[in-house]
From Swiss-Prot:
GO terms for molecular function: exodeoxyribonuclease VII activity; nucleic acid binding. Its EC number is 3.1.11.6. This is Exodeoxyribonuclease 7 large subunit. Its main location: cytoplasm. GO terms for cellular component: cytoplasm; exodeoxyribonuclease VII complex. It is found in: Cytoplasm. Bidirectionally degrades single-stranded DNA into large acid-insoluble oligonucleotides, which are then degraded further into small acid-soluble oligonucleotides. The gene is xseA.
Amino acid sequence: MYIKVLSVSELNNYIKRVVDSDYILSNAQVKGEISNFKFHSSGHVYFSLKDEGGKINCIMFRSNAEKLKFIPENGMKVNVKGRVSVYVKDGAYQLYCTEITPEGRGELYEAFEKLKEKLLNEGMFSEEHKRNIPKYPKMIGVITSPTGAAIRDIINVATRRNKSVDMIICPTLVQGVNAPGELIKALDYLNNREDIDTIILARGGGSIEELWAFNDEKLAYAVYNSKKPVVTGVGHETDFTIVDFVSDRRAPTPSAAAEIAVPNINEEMNSFVSLKRALDTSIKTYIQNKCNQLEIAKRMLEKNSPEILIVNGYSSIDNFKYVLDMRIANKIKIEKEKILRYNSILKSNSPINILNKGYSIISDEIGNNISNVDKLKEPDKVHITFKDGKVNAKIDILR
């Protein structure tokens, strides 16, 4: 029988075709422990899946890696779905993964994600729906197991923070098929009490199966529709349940839930003292500013009082009168000097002074002064005025 000699590439391609045509290998479901886990910059995920007897290299392409509901870690036991194929270039076979789920949680995890997506689409996780937790509650309702560590932690934290806050405990199952119903009844009971300010829904840590009651759909609606604000503290910090998403506030632990629901009286007192001091300082500053403004207004009023205005008015009148008197006196003095000067001029040019110098004034019979001889004719009569009297004369000869 003749057997063809194959090249390495031909052999690898042949093996790839054989593997790819195998139904089981094309629809593989494998469980094992993750090792050498790595996120590549391309977005692809590379890791190995191993057990006590062997190991297989795995790859998950970016399109599937983006759909992961959790972050895989080395040492984590998982279930993987995918297909086995051969990488021709290296001649190595590997598992091409399409899904990765934590081992033992596959169905529960899928149910959790399905319900979470449903409630998310209904808007039940909206921040707009979440209410503020009362800052100064008088009564807090606690729903949890009466025998677990959670109730002890809640009581211890609440007592330490504020002894004046009362609590009513509603003991219920916190795991098992009957737990959701009891939790819902406890919620209804506390919602019907008018004295309840806040509700704490809590339990200690556990496996996903033990915490599953808090992933119940009916319980989620009951928490969402609660008339009282609900604080959840289920499991440990890394545990998330459906009620955590629909509650008004999620706490990582039952103790943390008590810290959220119960105010620290010492911190509140210190805050009150600080606020009082700040208020006192603010009031004192306000009063001092008003006193300063009042003093300024008082000074302005004193400066502009009617009495001061009248006194200032009288002073202004006196000053004005003084200035006016001075100006009038000065004006009179100037006018007197003018009169004296004009009088001197008049006296110097007075006809009487001219007559005193030996001159005389000749006028005709009607009193007109005659200054030229051509105004006379023979035998006109004239009057001659001397300094000490008058004489009448007749013109006999004109020369």
